[in-house]
From Swiss-Prot:
Keyword Cytoplasm in record: no
Organism placement in taxonomy: Bacteria, Pseudomonadati, Pseudomonadota, Betaproteobacteria, Burkholderiales
Cofactor note: Binds 1 [2Fe-2S] cluster per subunit. This cluster acts as a Lewis acid cofactor.
Complex formation: Homodimer.
Annotated source species: Burkholderia thailandensis (strain ATCC 700388 / DSM 13276 / CCUG 48851 / CIP 106301 / E264)
Primary gene name: ilvD
The keyword Lyase is annotated on this UniProt entry: yes
Annotated protein name in UniProt: Dihydroxy-acid dehydratase
Pathway(s): Amino-acid biosynthesis; L-isoleucine biosynthesis; L-isoleucine from 2-oxobutanoate: step 3/4; Amino-acid biosynthesis; L-valine biosynthesis; L-valine from pyruvate: step 3/4
Alphabetized UniProt keyword annotations: 2Fe-2S, Amino-acid biosynthesis, Branched-chain amino acid biosynthesis, Iron, Iron-sulfur, Lyase, Magnesium, Metal-binding
Binding residues for Mg(2+): D82, D124, K125, E447
Length: 557
């Protein structure tokens, strides 16, 4: 039986003789035209350590495709380094790159009639970009995560990239020496691989195991390790089998599968960005999914992993403790996962987990039993109120001060807010408001890791609130609320906040409230005028014109 169900449209018949001529130039032989064409979306880049170690994985996948008697076709996908662009105008391109990556993969796979695709990526937006594409085109596909970085070390302390961001605040506050500042800077990122805590890259890749679109254990492997290369090869072999079975992404990505993925995100203390990305993935798969679904799952799934940014350990520690399959097995046994969901292997979640222990190992402190959960409910909460009629997202577990009411300190750009924090103009009890940074206003919903890390570095992480219509890095923690919708640029209430207004953030009541009476707000709204777009040409202008609100995933189509 021939498995070139799609590629035959470009390789078979008299009319396709010129097409075959071009394939011969690539080294194809006549019998290759009866084999499936397998795309390998290559995210390798020397822009960032997250992607600098991907070529070995791509090479392994290509070899495995050949060994499986199929034709590999590599093509490139771009990446933006969130960590390197953070705090600059370049960060506005980060979320945009999610859409660009999805469009690149769709364009190549559909334009070349590929029969399947192995997507290989590393930095934050690579994962949702790739999964959006797979859900959208519904061609057999698998995601290969590039793997995590190993932790850095300085004077006996484990480091991640967030350590370097927080060091900026500590150093400017006089709480860190020049030697330690430079020591953290030079040692925070010791290897290739994506940022090491349960930040956005590890959050999304971990969830893909539960979604059924990546192989078990693959998300917590370190990029430099041989097992990561071996996993990439196995992923390619599994993908070729999926092509033969005609097992497609939408056979796997169902509403129940997304519930599984989000349950793992809650259990591991994952990134707020996952809310935005799963709204987008569900949209691409044409699945009914809303921010209320996250809140529904939060209320029933506990946090059972002690992982950075709010915890102690990193992804390599989680891997040694049993990885995501151990987390999934605990959730499955507690009735918190759908065991009948299909995976890319052709087996169900329950079948995949049958040999995983029901109890985590006693010699580790990363994964806790359900009855010893760190928090009885999930950490990613949807807040609402007159400041966020359409919702906002916050991490609410582990807060020493879960309720804050304080004066608004209003900034219409990130740089002026960061300067105020570093210049000690922000005091305990303040609520920093960062606005005009949403999907349309930013544009691109840049992440606010620089100001939030500076607040923590200044020792104000438990006493200062921060709200924004932009996003937060997966490395952010503290009393911070993002994804405020409607955003300021379209006239959301956040646009009406004035310096000194009283704002309440209440993690118990899931409330985000501007304490100004309705009559005054109506007066301000009548006087408000939409600002001119920050960009009128180029990709940011295109994104601003097409982007939907944050509570709809900030998608463009």
């Amino acid at each position: 039986m021939s498995y070139n169900r799609r590629s035959k449209n470009i390789t078979q018949g008299v009319a396709r003789s010129p097409n075959r001529s071009m394939y011969y130039a690539l080294g194809y032989q006549k019998d290759d035209f009866d084999k499936p064409m397998i795309g390998v979306a290559n995210g390798h880049s020397t822009i960032t350590p997250c992607n600098a170690g991907l070529q070995r994985l791509v090479d392994a996948a290509v070899s495995a495709v050949k060994q499986a008697d199929a034709n590999p076709q590599t093509f490139g996908t771009p990446t933006i380094s969130d960590g390197m662009s953070m705090g600059t105008e370049g960060m506005k391109y980060s979320l945009v790159s999610r859409e660009v990556i999805a469009d690149c993969i769709e364009t190549c796979v559909q334009g070349q009639w590929m029969d399947g695709v192995v997507v290989v990526g590393g930095c934050d937006k690579n994962m949702p970009g790739g999964m959006i594409a797979l859900a959208r085109i519904n061609v057999p596909g698998i995601y290969v995560y590039g793997g995590t970085i190993r932790p850095g070390h300085w004077k006996g302390k484990d480091l991640t990239i967030v350590s370097a961001f927080e060091a900026v605040g500590e150093f400017t506050a006089g709480r860190m020496s020049q030697e330690d500042f430079e020591g953290v800077e030079k040692n925070a990122c010791p290897t290739t691989g994506s940022c090491g805590g349960m930040y956005t890259a590890n959050t999304m890749s971990s969830s893909f195991e539960a979604l059924g679109m990546s192989l078990l254990y693959s998300s917590t492997m370190a990029n430099p390790d041989q097992e990561k290369v071996d996993s990439a090869a196995e992923s390619a072999r599994v993908l070729v089998e999926a092509v033969k079975k005609d097992l497609k992404p939408r056979d796997i990505i169902t509403k129940q599968a997304i519930e599984n993925a989000v349950s793992v995100i809650m259990a591991t203390g994952g990134s707020t960005n996952a809310v935005l990305h799963y709204l987008a993935i569900a949209h691409a798969a044409e699945i009914d999914w809303s921010i209320e679904d996250f809140e529904r799952i939060r209320k029933r799934v506990p946090v059972i992993c002690d992982l950075k940014p709010s915890g102690q350990y990193v992804a390599t520690d989680l891997h040694a403790a049993g990885g995501i399959p151990q987390v999934m097995k605990l959730l499955l046994d507690a009735g918190l996962l759908h065991g009948d969901c299909m995976t890319i292997t052709g087996r169900t979640i329950a079948e995949e987990l049958k040999d995983v222990p029901s109890v985590p190992r006693a010699d580790q402190k990363v994964i806790y039993p359900i009855d010893q959960a760190l928090y009885k409910e999930g950490h990613l909460a949807i807040l609402k109120g007159n400041l966020a009629e359409d919702g906002a997202v916050a991490k609410i577990t582990g807060l020493k001060n879960p309720v804050i009411t304080g004066p608004a300190r209003v900034f219409d750009d990130e740089q002026s807010a960061l300067a105020a924090i570093l210049d000690d103009k922000i005091r305990a009890g303040d609520v920093v408001v960062l606005r005009y940074l949403g999907p349309q206003g930013g544009p691109g919903m840049p992440e606010m890791l620089a100001p939030t890390s500076a607040i923590i570095g200044k020792g104000l992480g438990e006493s200062v609130g921060l709200i924004t219509d932009g996003r937060f890095s997966g490395g952010t923690w503290g009393m911070v609320v993002g994804h405020v919708a409607p955003e300021a640029f379209v006239g959301g209430t956040i646009a009406l906040v004035q310096e000194g207004d009283s704002i309440t953030i209440d993690a118990h009541k899931l409330l985000l409230q501007l304490n100004v009476d309705d009559a005054e707000l109506a007066r301000r709204r009548a006087a408000w005028k939409q600002p001119a777009p920050r960009y009128t040409r180029g990709v940011l202008a295109k994104y601003a014109a097409l982007a939907r609100p944050a509570n709809k995933g900030a998608v463009t189509g």
